[in-house]
Amino acid sequence: EALRGEGAVLRNLAGERFMQDADERAELAPRDVVARAIHSQIVAEGDPHVWLDISHLPRNKVLRSFPAIAAHCLQQGVDITSEAIPVAPTQHYFCGGVKTGLRGETSVPGLFACGEVACTGLHGANRLASNSLLEGLVFGHRAARAAVAHARRAPIEVTLGSAAGPGCPRIVSTDPHELRMLRTVQDGMHTTMWQHAGIVRSSRGLASAMEELNALSLNLSGAFTGGEHSLEALEVENLLTVAQLVLACAARRKESRGLHFTRDYVHATDSEKRDTVLSSSDVDLQLTRAMPELVSR
């Protein structure tokens, strides 16, 4: 993104620029537009990447402006001052997350969230470039101060390093069969979410993904038959829950807005200009139209 801002251009396998056809701002278009344009080229050409070319700029300028990028690419055998860089979209940022108030407080007393895990509403439907400091620094500072103030009012009555809670001891799985099963479930979830809940979505794809995740959840249930659960199993279970919430939320939005783009509704509509908050109770997903009442004090 920094390279594009400095004048780098995107080219397909034939060496042709394609961003002018996708948006009048060409390479300076918002990241969701650029990602979809690259995705379209990759699908059409059957190649895993396109090319980012900054070789037309003076060598000294490139090395002075992007020393870290130049060094990293050179380690991979690419001299960005004379060669194009193979690039492809990837999961980079999550605009949704745990709903918080202005100080990182959540609907769970004593639980605070900040950074990419939190949904502050700061970025709307599409984060601008180089804008993460607001989440990490500003809301991190606010959440830390609020957490300290809360702890002083209500001291924690648990010894650090003890059990995470009743019936949930901190243990690491040593069962090879369970570890293989967890890896299979996690890999399947990653593949499904990338294919159906990634850059370009559709109603059919989201429904198919939900069916696949439900099947993976059944496979995972074997890890919870005993009285103790490993951290690995709990983590995969939480990942599946979040993935199901993402799918359910995306399926209910009948429009395209920001990072959420669906082939079935390619334009944004005023009727869908709202927040969507989902809560999970076991495996049942419930849609809440209104935001939970969170008051900062």
For the regions a protein language model found, what residue spans apply to each?
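FAD/FMN-dependent oxidoreductases across multiple families
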Residues: P67-F112
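Glycine- and aromatic-enriched mobile tails/lids
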Residues: R17-Q20, R25-E27, A37-Q41, Y93, ...
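An anion/pyrophosphate-binding glycine-rich loop and adjacent beta-alpha core
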Residues: E1-I85, A146-R152
